[in-house]
Amino acid sequence: MTGSDGKVRVAMIGAGVMSNRVHYPSLASFEDVEIAAICDIDTERLRVTADQYAVEKRYLDYRTMVEEIAPDAVYAIGQPHIFYDIWTWCLEQGQNLYIEKPMGITLHHARSLAHLAEKHGCITQVSFQRRSTPLVSKLHAACLQRGPIVHAVCRFYKCAMDPYLEARDHMMDDGVHAIDTLRWMCGGEVVNVHSVVKRVGVPDINFFSALLEFDNGATGLMINSWTSGRRIFDVEMHAPGICAEAEHEGTGTLYIDGDTQGVTYDTREVAGSDAFHTYGGFESKNREFIDCLKAGTLPGSHFGDAVKTMEVAETILAQATLKGI
């Protein structure tokens, strides 16, 4: 799996904003990882990124890069409606693959990717990094010490009142984050979905709420709104005699046995860093993928798991369609 120097060799497709903000710095921080080559059709972005990370091998064609470099894994970070064909090609070559969310923009995309990954034995990861934020991971573990999660809540609000006219809708852009975070917090499999959605002042759906029932008895509640006055992403986790409330990029408080003061933790202090890619969970998500490459195992957000998040998202949208919304 690794090169002669023991490092995992990674080939990067894409040198855009997201990659440069969180994935390149995460990978560059790992002593056992080599960014072996970079590909981008924008020559200036390619030059700037490759120079910053001292990467000699630079390509405009991803197929040529993968064939010549023969990496241990490919990172293909870009818009899902543009990158879907790149992802399928990589999987058909048997390449281990890391992508950003969403896992395509339709359930057909997601199921096809999961099928190809399983068929070709690829180790994959969708970057649902809110599962691995150090602060929330710490609070989640503390709750589980008291017993299974009874119920969890995820709120994701933004102030974005204009019509959303991208290739993907609000659900696939942001809603999947809330669904996936709830799935991780609650554990188990979603067995029932009850939803209410709205169109508030725009032609597209910009309000989602759903109650998710899990086969382990846990209940998850998500509320996503782009009609709010500010951005919020926060969670609650409740287990017997304990609860946690947290904003991934701010603070989290743990309450035990009726205490109303709680113990508050700062996300940067828990992560031990002021770097966004670290306290935001991206470094941990990348580390999980690299470790699984070395061990030959599947990480938590492999395509076979991430497709379940997409299925819940499509269920909510289907319920809206059946209601005539």
For every predicted segment, state its role.
Residues M1-K7, A73-Y75, C122, D215, ...:
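C-terminal helix-rich "cap/oligomerization" subdomain common to oxidoreductases
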Residues S19, I99, T124-V126, V153, ...:
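Hydrophobic residues in well-ordered beta-strands that form the structural core
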Residues D42, Y53, K57-L116:
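Beta-loop-alpha module in the N-terminal Rossmann-like domain of NAD(P)-dependent dehydrogenases
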Residues M18, S273-R287, S301:
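Active-site loop of classical SDR/Rossmann-like NAD(P)-dependent oxidoreductases
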Residues S132-V153, M172-K198, L211-A218, Q319:
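Oxidoreductase and adenylate-handling cofactor-binding alpha/beta cores
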Residues I179-T253, Y279, E283-T297:
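Contiguous beta-strand/loop segments that form the cofactor/metal-binding neighborhood of enzyme cores
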Residues M1-Y53:
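N-terminal Rossmann-like dinucleotide-binding module
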